[in-house]
């Protein structure tokens, strides 16, 4: 079952489970709720962190049922959304984020620094301000992975460090 590797043998050092890779919110509610229940059954786990781009690109995925299930959990629930530009943060996203916050889900953001998309100080400031308006804490800023066909988005480490320093 889910969580067997975390709890057999018991590893009390594990306090947080992260659902990531692909997109966990692409699961059906039934699948996701089953997974959450399995995680809740692990006594030493205190936090559930869900990484997802769907609240940004498909905010309708954030349903009342999903939010109620997360609020019902004894786990501290954190959702890390993936927004890269302030223009992604429209009214529907604001409503989805408000619903999550109303159900005690902490919201963090993960951005990828992309050349010619968000690699200016102005753009990053606008993104951060918009995230704060939506109740989302800017948290992670990554450089792009080296994947075939994406070299035109690459920002070098020195450029990234320079932007963060400003």
Residues covered by each model-derived region:
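Glycine-rich active-site/cofactor-binding loop and its immediate structural neighborhood
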Residues: 1-7
């Amino acid at each position: 079952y889910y969580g067997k590797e975390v709890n057999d043998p018991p590893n009390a050092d594990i306090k947080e489970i992260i659902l990531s890779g692909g997109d966990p919110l692409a699961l059906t509610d039934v699948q996701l709720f089953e997974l959450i229940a399995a995680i809740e059954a692990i006594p030493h786990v205190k936090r559930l962190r869900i990484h997802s781009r769907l609240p940004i690109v498909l905010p309708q995925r954030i349903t009342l049922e999903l939010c109620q299930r997360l609020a019902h959990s004894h786990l501290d629930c954190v959702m890390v959304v993936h927004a890269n530009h302030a223009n992604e943060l429209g009214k529907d996203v604001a409503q989805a984020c408000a619903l999550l916050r109303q159900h005690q889900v902490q919201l963090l953001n993960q951005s990828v620094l992309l050349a010619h998309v968000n690699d200016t100080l102005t753009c990053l400031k606008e993104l951060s301000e918009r995230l704060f308006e939506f109740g989302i804490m800017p948290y992670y800023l990554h450089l792009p992975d080296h994947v075939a066909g994406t070299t035109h988005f690459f920002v070098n480490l020195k450029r990234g460090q320079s932007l963060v320093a400003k």
